[in-house]
């Protein structure tokens, strides 16, 4: 299930590049972020596929005065949400201004910059490991849009009826 993307881009930009990292099994090992006071410049991922580490392409220019690596505790830690802010007006800057990643055990960020003229977004993916990847766009000025993939559950949780039967057998009438 594709969610988003959110963000905005400068209509004057002629270098918009779409990217999609949704074909992976959802196991992210690391996230690499280049950012600064202008916002999120680029994002890159390292996935676990068939027991091997696979590095995605970098999505956006490798500039910005800060660089962060988010390393998840694979296989026990997984993405449960992403939130942030994007600039809603035309400008020659990265419109994705800040990003924060939530997992089942931790919170990473926010990375980038915050401001009162930014719109906020939040994708909450539930407590289960349902994250399926990222997608978005970038141009020469930085990350413009970002979205996520959600893998809906395919199996109902099992209901433990053993305790219910035990409780019923202990009921005494009259």
UniProtKB/Swiss-Prot annotation:
Protein name: Inactive protein RESTRICTED TEV MOVEMENT 1
UniProt KW Cytoplasm keyword: yes
Family statement drawn from the similarity comment of this UniProt entry: Belongs to the jacalin lectin family.
Function of the protein: Unable to mediate restriction of long-distance movement of the pathogenic tobacco etch virus (TEV) without causing a hypersensitive response or inducing systemic acquired resistance.
GO biological process: defense response
Name of the gene encoding the protein in the UniProt record: RTM1
Gene3D superfamilies associated with the record: Jacalin-like lectin domain
Gene Ontology molecular functions: carbohydrate binding
Localization (cell): Cytoplasm
One of the Pfam families matching this protein, by short name: Jacalin
InterPro entries from the UniProt entry: Jacalin-like_lectin_dom, Jacalin-like_lectin_dom_plant, Jacalin-like_lectin_dom_sf
Major localisation: cytoplasm
Assigned keywords, A-Z: Cytoplasm, Lectin, Plant defense
The protein's assembly and partners: Self-interacts. Interacts with RTM3.
């Amino acid at each position: 299930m594709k969610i988003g993307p959110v963000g905005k881009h400068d209509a004057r930009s002629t270098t918009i590049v779409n990217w999609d990292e949704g074909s992976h099994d959802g196991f992210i090992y690391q996230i690499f972020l280049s950012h600064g006071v202008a916002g999120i410049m680029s994002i890159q991922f390292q996935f676990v596929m068939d027991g091997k580490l696979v590095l995605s392409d970098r999505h956006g220019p490798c500039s910005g005065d800060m660089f962060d690596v988010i390393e998840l505790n694979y296989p026990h830690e997984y993405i449960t949400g992403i939130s942030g802010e994007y600039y809603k007006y035309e400008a020659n800057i990265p419109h994705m201004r800040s990003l924060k990643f939530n997992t089942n055990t931790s919170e990473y960020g926010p990375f980038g910059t915050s401001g009162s003229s930014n719109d906020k977004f939040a994708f909450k993916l539930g407590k289960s490991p349902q994250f399926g990847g990222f997608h978005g766009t970038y141009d020469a000025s930085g990350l413009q849009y970002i979205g996520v993939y959600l893998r809906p559950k395919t199996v109902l949780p099992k209901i433990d009826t053993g305790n219910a039967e035990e409780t019923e057998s202990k009921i005494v009438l009259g």
